[in-house]
Structure formats: structure tokens, C-alpha cells
UniProtKB/Swiss-Prot annotation:
This is UDP-N-acetylglucosamine--N-acetylmuramyl-(pentapeptide) pyrophosphoryl-undecaprenol N-acetylglucosamine transferase. Pathway: Cell wall biogenesis; peptidoglycan biosynthesis. It comes from the Bacteria. Keywords: Cell cycle, Cell division, Cell inner membrane, Cell membrane, Cell shape, Cell wall biogenesis/degradation, Glycosyltransferase, Membrane, Peptidoglycan synthesis, Transferase.
Length: 356
């Protein structure tokens, strides 16, 4: 098929990884995929590695900026819009698909001005600034979590595209005649509060329920985190970054982590119970809303950072680790919330709009 698709996603892995999953599906269907990003985001590393043409526009966020930056903002946005319009004219896509990040605002408006169908996908339970603005004129609005956007004929609840290897057909039985296995995830850039909290909390557990521990600390935090575990007499494997997440998830019985949208979707895919500590300063507190998706169904416990010290974490760990059937029930519930067809569903929506 001689047709181009322009994907817009940038900044963080939470936007880029779901978009990459869809890019691969577009390619499998014969489309040529182009990517619109910004010079500062993770896309500059990942998209060339994926062999996709990357087009860049210069745009940054405005929240928390000083007065001078706000005064310059209209000129920055106008320049970014002109750059995005040039890319749209060059690529001539049958549709433009936005997955979030600063790039999607100018890119989405450029699609509208060019008369190209625009589809947006929101990964979080609370829509980002750009997607809220674009939703009013997008051809379709895809959401990972139900009711992120107001009900409309163009809304589709699709789930988050995640790597297919993460899906387990049936969650395995936790604590099957062995020690429990605890996976701690601080995010690819780490989460220092978790790096400090978990060693102290685990040190308070009775010896007979001490789990095996695999802790992702984030870049440059592995040595000091490993030292914290040694200082309190807890054995743990600490790594700055976990390359094979499918293997890590299949190993674990319980996960302690933040509540980014992609993490929530991966926990469901892998059928894993979790203790979720939402990032307290996330924009619009979207991580708390993400966490509620699993917690209200009984697949996770939410533990706000402000009220969770070592004693509180130790008490919760003790509760769940001493009740294997509760862990297994949480695992089954998590798996029931997974959307294994999310990637296909999003791409189907795009193809329908492009050729409908």
C-alpha cells in the first residue's frame, strides 16, 4: 500500500511506546510511517533505532514558565505550527495520529488546517492539555481508560497499546511453594522516594515472609540503593534499568511502582497485583486517577506518598504476602482489565477514518 501515516508523539516513553506499537502495526499493514517529534524528547533515540523517518519541530511546554517565556509563547507556537504544516505538506499522510506530548498541539492544528483526518489517543485517565484542545475537532478520540473524555459519537475506549510479549494468558499462582517475589519499579528514570522507602520497609518484615527482591532503581541510583539494602540486612538484586520487562513481570508475584498510564496497562496485561504510589506532583494528579482504575476493581492498593512511610509499607506488604489467595485474586482481576487488542483497535480506528 502506497500510503503515509504521520504519528505525533514525544517527550516521554509513556507517549512514545504506545505510538511505536501502533507504528509497527501500520507497517505490518503496508503503510509507511513518518514521525513528528521535538528535539529534546526520547523519540530522538528510539525512532531512528526503529528505522522510521523523524521530523522535528521546536516547541516546549508552557506550564510553570516565567513571564518572559509566556510572552514569547505565541511566537514559538506560530513557528512550530509553520514547521508542522511544512511536514504535513511533505509527507501527505492519509491521517495524522497524536499520542501526546508538546508536539501534538501544533501538529494536530496543522492537520486540521490541511484537511487531513486527525485521530488522538490519550494514555492517561486525565487528558493532557494538548489532547483536551484537539478533541474538539479530531475525527476520532481514543482513550485508554473509560470516560476520560465526554461521551460523543467519535469517542472510542481502546486501552493502551502495549508490547504483545507482556500478555499472559492466565496469571500464574503466586507463592507456589516458594518465597514471594517482589518487583520494585521506579520508572526508567528512577524514583528516589521508592529507592529509600523499600529497603527500610522490607527490613521490618518477619524473616519467614521476606520476599526475593528485584529493584529497578533508575540510572545512577543502583549503587546507593544496593547499599541501602545491605545496610538493613535485606538481600536484593538492584539494576538501574530492566531491559526485559516481560521476563521481570513473569518472575514477579507483586509489584511496587508508580502509576504511569503505560505501567497500569502493563500490570493488567501481565496479570500482576500491585501496590501503587502515584507520583505526587504529576500534572492534574493523573497518576492517582490511573491508579484508581486498578484499585477500585480490587487489583491494586493505592498508597499515597505523603502518608506512606516504611511502617505503612511494611504493614501492607505483610498483609498481602501472608495471603496468597488474595494475591491470586488480585492477579486474576488485573488480567481481566487488560485490553490485548488495543493496538489493533487503535489502528483500525485510524484506517476507518483515513479510508472511510
Amino acid at each position: 500500500m502506497d500510503a503515509n501515516v504521520l504519528i505525533m508523539a514525544g517527550g516521554t516513553g509513556g507517549h512514545v511506546f504506545p505510538a511505536l506499537a501502533c507504528a509497527r502495526e501500520f507497517q505490518a499493514r503496508g503503510y509507511k510511517v513518518h514521525w513528528l517529534g521535538t528535539p529534546r524528547g526520547i523519540e530522538n533515540e528510539l525512532i531512528p533505532q526503529a528505522g522510521l523517518p523523524l521530523h522535528l519541530i521546536n516547541v516546549t511546554g508552557l506550564r510553570g514558565k516565567g513571564r518572559l517565556s509566556l510572552l514569547k509563547a505565541p511566537f514559538m507556537l506560530l513557528k512550530a505550527l509553520m514547521q508542522a504544516r511544512k511536514v504535513v505538506r511533505q509527507v501527505k499522510p492519509v491521517c495524522v495520529v497524536g499520542f501526546g506530548g508538546y508536539v501534538t498541539g501544533p501538529g494536530g492544528l496543522a492537520a486540521r488546517l490541511a484537511g487531513v483526518p486527525l485521530i488522538i489517543h490519550e494514555q492517561n485517565a486525565v487528558a493532557g492539555t494538548a489532547n483536551r484542545s484537539l478533541a474538539s475537532f479530531a475525527s476520532r478520540v481514543c482513550e485508554a481508560f473509560p470516560n476520560t473524555f465526554a461521551a460523543s459519537a467519535k469517542r472510542r475506549t481502546t486501552g493502551n497499546p502495549v508490547r504483545v510479549e507482556l500478555f499472559l494468558e492466565t496469571p500464574r499462582q503466586a507463592l507456589a511453594g516458594r518465597k514471594a517475589r517482589l518487583l520494585v519499579l521506579g520508572g526508567s528514570l528512577g524514583a528516589e522516594p521508592l529507592n529509600k522507602l523499600l529497603p527500610d520497609a522490607l527490613a521490618q518484615l518477619p524473616q519467614d515472609i521476606q520476599p526475593e527482591v528485584f529493584h529497578q532503581s533508575g540510572k545512577n541510583h543502583d549503587a546507593v540503593t544496593a547499599e541501602r539494602y545491605r545496610n538493613v540486612g535485606v538481600e536484593a538484586q538492584v539494576a538501574p534499568f530492566i531491559q526485559n520487562m516481560a521476563q521481570a513481570y513473569s518472575w514477579a508475584d507483586l509489584v511496587v511502582c508508580r502509576a504511569g498510564a503505560l505501567t497500569i496497562s502493563e500490570l493488567a496485561a501481565a496479570g500482576l497485583p500491585s501496590l501503587l504510589i502515584p507520583l505526587p506532583h504529576a500534572i492534574d494528579d493523573h497518576q492517582s486517577r490511573n491508579a484508581d482504575y486498578l484499585a477500585r476493581e480490587g487489583a491494586a492498593f493505592v498508597m499515597p506518598q505523603a502518608t506512606t512511610g516504611a511502617a505503612e509499607m511494611a504493614a501492607r506488604l505483610k498483609e498481602v504476602l501472608m495471603q496468597p489467595e488474595q494475591l491470586n485474586s488480585m492477579a486474576r482481576t488485573a488480567r481481566s482489565l487488560a485490553k490485548p487488542d488495543a493496538t489493533n483497535t487503535v489502528v483500525n480506528v485510524c484506517v476507518e477514518v483515513a479510508h472511510g
